[in-house]
């Protein structure tokens, strides 16, 4: 019989920089998970993605064991890296803070495709383009 899940924890952590300090420690500690083991395993699995924020979904079971699934980085982080900006525009309708090309947009859409609710790259590009527009990033042809 399968183990029963007692908790589902969602965190967004910097790749290969998870520590037992908040927010990881309190989130996992209240469910009795070995925090140090999780941090070590997370850091090992995200070692190649340094500099990005990687969301993780942790399933905690009755016997206090856990499994976790790494998601793709948020589109806003990927767009900010591509446009070489620190953050989006505070007034995206009037102030443009950067720009990316259609090729960069397609690359980001390909990265995000597994986590989006679509299977077509054209639809994924529209989703990511909407995020870019809301950040004040313009798309160049």
Swiss-Prot record:
Coiled coil: none annotated. One of its GO terms (molecular function) is structural constituent of ribosome. It comes from the Eukaryota. One of its GO terms (cellular component) is chloroplast. Keywords: Chloroplast, Plastid, Ribonucleoprotein, Ribosomal protein, RNA-binding, rRNA-binding. PROSITE patterns: RIBOSOMAL_L11. Its main location: plastid. It holds the Pfam family Ribosomal_L11_N. Transmembrane segments: none annotated. It is found in: Plastid, Chloroplast. InterPro entries: Ribosomal_uL11 (IPR000911), Ribosomal_uL11_bac-typ (IPR006519), Ribosomal_uL11_C (IPR020783), Ribosomal_uL11_C_sf (IPR036769), Ribosomal_uL11_CS (IPR020785), Ribosomal_uL11_N (IPR020784), Ribosomal_uL11_N_sf (IPR036796). One of its GO terms (biological process) is translation. Forms part of the ribosomal stalk which helps the ribosome interact with GTP-bound translation factors. Belongs to the universal ribosomal protein uL11 family. Part of the ribosomal stalk of the 50S ribosomal subunit. Interacts with L10 and the large rRNA to form the base of the stalk. L10 forms an elongated spine to which L12 dimers bind in a sequential fashion forming a multimeric L10(L12)X complex. NCBIfam families: L11_bact. PANTHER family: 60S RIBOSOMAL PROTEIN L12, LARGE RIBOSOMAL SUBUNIT PROTEIN UL11M. HAMAP family: Ribosomal_uL11. This is Large ribosomal subunit protein uL11c.
């Amino acid at each position: 019989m399968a183990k029963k899940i007692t908790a589902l924890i969602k965190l967004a952590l910097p790749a290969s920089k998870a520590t037992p300090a908040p927010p990881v420690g309190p989130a996992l500690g209240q469910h009795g998970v070995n925090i140090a083991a999780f941090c070590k395993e997370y850091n090992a699995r995200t070692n190649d993605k340094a500099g990005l924020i990687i969301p993780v979904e942790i399933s905690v079971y009755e016997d206090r064991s856990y499994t976790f699934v790494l998601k793709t980085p948020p589109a806003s982080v990927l767009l900010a890296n591509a446009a070489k900006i620190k953050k989006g525009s505070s007034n995206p309708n009037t102030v443009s803070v950067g720009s990316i090309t259609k090729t960069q947009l397609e690359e980001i859409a390909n990265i995000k495709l597994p986590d989006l609710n679509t299977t077509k790259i054209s639809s994924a590009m529209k989703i990511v383009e909407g995020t870019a527009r809301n950040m004040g990033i313009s798309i160049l042809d």
